[in-house]
Amino acid sequence: MKQIITQHGWGLNKYFWDDYKVDFLKNNWHWQDNERGYFSTNNYQAKWIKSESKKEIRMTLCHSFGFHLMPKKILKEATHIVLINSFNNFLPLSNKRNFILRSLKRMETKIIKDEPKDMLKEFIYRSFMPNHMNNSFKKIFYKSLESLNKTLLLSDLKELYMNRDFPVFLKKDCKIIFIKSENDLILDNESSNNFLDSLNKTLDREPTLIKLAQQGHCLNNLNLYEILRNKLNA
């Protein structure tokens, strides 16, 4: 049995994955989306389906902060973890740290002052650059702005830049696929590299690195199924 559980990042929802899941479903993958609930009071956390299959694949797709939102139990039991523009510590150690922190504090202020909509629109727009927002998410995003869960947006934004130790719960022999966009305007390159370096040093099996040209923090206009299928068969 081939299973996928996804976790979107901050300011997004499960519809972020809709364009990608089509090819997986066509190829007999069982797909479940976690929903954090930024645009409503509804949230959902999927669980692995028990299977006796000897060729079991349990793959998590984590985008950005989604790695920290995904329950540890799900990650522990995964055979494959796909990290898409993910991080352990969002803030870099270099002198860019204070500049990025000030930007995050301005975003917090917008939420506190009850002005989150324009801020979130700008964040999502920059997240998809140099591409456009994917159509499935775009339709839902603009409709859902009226029902924003501002309390959750704010508390998760504060969590996003907390300093963290290395995630020791990861299995040493876990197969990790580390996807890194080359035009990411949200996640600093240093933060991404630091996470990859830590994984390389700590795990028995080095992560498989995939660099994507012409992609931003949020992926669009690519066939994620083919990219991952090639790595699974490698």
Region annotations inferred by a language model:
Residues 185-191:
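Conserved alpha/beta-hydrolase "acid-adjacent" motif
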Residues 1-43:
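Conserved HGGG/HGGXW glycine-rich cap/lid loop of the alpha/beta-hydrolase fold
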Residues 172, 177-180, 184:
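Short beta-strand/loop motif that positions the catalytic acidic residue
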